[in-house]
């Protein structure tokens, strides 16, 4: 794991889902530490400083797009937001930010880069 207090995070060859492959330099990003690996959920926000798509492997038809990124941390979370806070939000059509996060993170609990709605980004800003 990475210490959440680090000023810069590097993530190599991360799986992308839910438009995560569209990540670009200058994008705002929220960093969640995997609770499956002992992390605490939302830990930081930052700005994407570098993006490098992972080349596709030859001969494999279906591949999840992967990307390596560098993130410059701009703030540490001041309130907790993790699986225990989100798991009850499972009415997939209610439009709530908590439900969007629960759906995208925990239905397939693997490390990943995801795209989120503007409303969910505003919601997450409230944790800093």
Region locations from a protein language model:
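Aromatic- and Lys/Arg-enriched surface recognition patch
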Residues: 41, 47-114, 118
